[in-house]
UniProtKB/Swiss-Prot annotation:
Its main location: cytoplasm. It comes from Mus musculus. GO terms for biological process: cell division; protein catabolic process at presynapse. This is Neuronal-specific septin-3. The gene is Septin3. Residues 68-75 are annotated as: G1 motif.
Length: 350
């Protein structure tokens, strides 16, 4: 009889032993995408025109740094790139400035306008880099300058009464000039790019490419790419930042074929086949700067200005600056000291 006792338990007793089922957590519904035909014109496409008008009104900042030994034509190339005298040539420095004992940082700002769009261009030169007998750690002042610009932006960003538009002095692009030796990269080249590629977008260029034959140029480009790969040096556009397959396909071609750009710069015009062209006069003829059969200047110009300028700015802000910002705030245990200067902080930077 005792064996039948458990079966004689009441429904109430059983309900105490069996836990009530837990309610399922509410799952947020995903928005449903419906491909329906619009009944009429809405005007979504005007956002592009709105953005264009705003950019034309306010303009935009672009800060480019040039690094390399003296005599590689850095200033000439930048002047050719922007078709204006935006960088002072070494010959224009006074006698005392010609050979700096240490690396100096010289930033010159310009406003360039084309088609109603204003670009606030800053060219940052680095005279003295690689020109000393002992060039050990000569990249440090350059890295310090780059980080100082991140710090300035960060302090403005966390300011309680910050400016409506924060002045952007961050370096968006660093053109690193490689000497056209035709052999291999110098230890200084590798050391600089290894350290600085972590904090800025480096675009390597082979200077004065007209001093090499086509075969020498091709072999040197391949050798440079191999050395950068072996030493784990990432140049722009970095593989890890490719957003999609289209980006990867386009950037792979640039990384594997174009980099480093073999360039020639010139601010002199010559008559060629009835046309005025920028070029360099040699005993063998005129080297046309914008002729792809002569050099890769046009590829560099299109890459920096016409196809990747906005991406250079975005990678600077979203990757390099954010990396600095996260480390800075983490090391500081929070926000940096906040300065309150209400009179200055309300000044806008149109």
């Amino acid at each position: 009889m005792s064996k039948g006792l458990p079966e004689a338990r009441t429904d109430a007793a059983m309900s105490e032993l069996v836990p009530e089922p837990r309610p399922k957590p509410a799952v947020p519904m995903k928005p449903v995408s419906i491909n329906s035909n619009l009944l009429g014109y809405i005007g979504i496409d005007t956002i592009i025109e709105q953005m264009r008008k705003k950019t034309m009104k306010t303009g935009f900042d672009f800060n480019i740094m040039v690094v390399g030994q003296s005599g590689l034509g850095k200033s000439t190339l930048v002047n050719t790139l922007f078709k204006s005298q935006v960088s002072r040539k070494a010959s224009s420095w006074n006698r005392e400035e010609k050979i700096p004992k240490t690396v100096e940082i010289k930033a010159i700002g310009h406003v360039i306008e084309e088609g109603g769009v204003k670009m606030k261009l800053t060219v940052i030169d680095t005279p003295g880099f690689g020109d000393q007998i002992n060039n050990e750690n000569c990249w440090e002042p350059i890295e310090k300058y780059i980080n100082e610009q991140y710090e300035k932006f960060l302090k403005e960003e966390v300011n309680i009464a910050r400016k409506k538009r924060i002045p952007d002095t961050r370096v968006h692009c660093c053109l690193y000039f490689i000497s056209p030796t035709g052999h291999s990269l110098r230890p200084l080249d590798l050391e600089f790019m290894k350290h600085l590629s972590k904090v800025v977008n480096i675009i390597p260029v082979i200077a004065k490419a007209d001093t090499m034959t086509l075969e020498e140029k091709s072999e040197f480009k391949q050798r440079v790419r191999k050395e950068l790969e072996v030493n784990g040096i990432e140049f722009y556009p970095q593989k890890e930042f490719d957003e999609d397959l289209e980006d990867k396909t386009e950037n792979d071609k640039i990384r594997q074929e174009s980099m480093p750009f073999a360039v020639v710069g010139s601010d002199k015009e010559y008559q060629v086949n009835g046309k005025r062209v920028l070029g360099r006069k040699t005993p063998w003829g005129i080297i046309e700067v914008e002729n792809l059969n002569h050099c890769e200047f046009a590829l560099l110009r299109d890459f920096v200005i016409r196809t990747h300028l906005q991406d250079l700015k975005e990678v600077t802000h979203n990757i390099h600056y954010e990396t600095y910002r996260a480390k800075r705030l983490n090391d500081n245990g929070g926000l940096p000291p906040v300065s309150v200067d209400t009179e200055e902080s309300h000044d806008s930077n149109p």
